[in-house]
């Protein structure tokens, strides 16, 4: 380097969503790394922008029946865990205090069987220290509507968001299921009910059958498909939702490398969730962050935030 010339600045990966300042747009998705205990000392944490804790219910849940809970597919993973978790009391007394060691914005994820349960969960977490935001897992079944997911229709989704909004004053995230006819309509309903951020997509409903026994391979019969197989479908839904709402979007679904991450951001995501890839390779955050910086440097783009929603559709 010649005398007098300063070293070029590294491209910036920091983003801000509804007041949440993330050092990178990479978010560890709920359920992948649990409550973070096993990763508290991992150098990978410095490449993440936020950490979403495993979904918590009001009472402990054992999850789906014993037997196979995951099945690998040619380009993904089908899981049927059944929201196994120790319950809210254990989260407050044990899991959350431990998670605070992660030195990352922590996002709690909650799942209820009724609107009232969601509201109670939000209310009891409202005074908890160390939580930057609350994610509503509205892909779980509504027992008052015969097991239909809360996120399957705008009215139910909005009811959950509105009830939690009354109890929770920090950023509120609605995480949407893709197993609907019009996900943008549901996203708008959540925004109107008070959601500060929309996250999508959760897994796609799936089934795997053993052709010899003629029985499902999963102990719970049905599961959720994640991994690279769903990425193009997830990108489309992120694009449609980002076009429909005026709040930030967290995109996810099949992210595997820096190119996938940037694709979601160009489609409209302000941050990107990492899920199945972390199971395959826990070093993915560093690899993806490095790849993003390399791309930005080559393209002479100073900040990744400039790419958010920059897609230009072909004419016609």
Put a short name on every predicted segment.
Residues 26-30, 49-53, 106-110, 134-136, ...:
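Hydrophobic faces of well-ordered beta-strands that scaffold small-molecule active sites
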């Amino acid at each position: 380097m010649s005398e007098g010339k300063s070293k070029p600045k590294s491209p910036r990966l920091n983003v801000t969503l509804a007041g949440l300042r993330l050092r990178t747009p990479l978010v560890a998705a709920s359920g992948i790394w649990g409550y973070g205990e096993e990763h508290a000392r991992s150098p990978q944490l410095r490449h993440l922008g936020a950490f979403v804790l495993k979904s918590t219910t009001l009472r402990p849940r054992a999850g789906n029946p014993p037997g196979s809970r995951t099945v690998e597919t040619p380009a993904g993973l089908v899981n049927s865990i059944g929201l196994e978790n120790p319950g809210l009391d254990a989260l407050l007394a044990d899991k959350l205090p431990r998670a605070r060691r992660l030195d990352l914005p922590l996002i709690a994820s909650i799942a209820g069987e009724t609107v009232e349960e969601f509201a109670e969960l939000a209310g009891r977490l409202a005074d908890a220290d160390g939580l930057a935001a609350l994610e509503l897992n509205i892909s779980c079944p509504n027992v008052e509507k015969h097991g239909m997911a809360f996120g399957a229709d705008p009215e139910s989704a909005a009811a959950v968001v509105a009830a939690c909004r009354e109890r929770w004053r920090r950023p509120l995230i609605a995480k949407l299921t893709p197993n609907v006819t019009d996900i943008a309509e549901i996203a708008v309903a959540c925004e109107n009910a008070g959601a500060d951020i929309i996250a999508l997509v959760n897994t796609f409903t799936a089934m795997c059958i053993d052709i010899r026994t003629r029985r499902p391979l999963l102990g719970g019969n049905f599961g959720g498909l994640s991994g690279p197989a769903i990425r193009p479908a997830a990108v489309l839904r992120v694009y449609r939702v980002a076009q429909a709402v005026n709040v930030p979007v967290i995109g996810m679904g099949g992210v595997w490398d820096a190119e996938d991450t940037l694709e979601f951001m160009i489609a409209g995501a302000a941050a990107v969730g990492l899920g199945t890839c972390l199971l395959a390779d826990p070093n993915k955050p560093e690899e993806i962050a490095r790849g993003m910086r390399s791309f930005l440097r080559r393209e002479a783009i100073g900040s990744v935030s400039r790419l958010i929603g920059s897609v230009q559709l072909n004419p016609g």
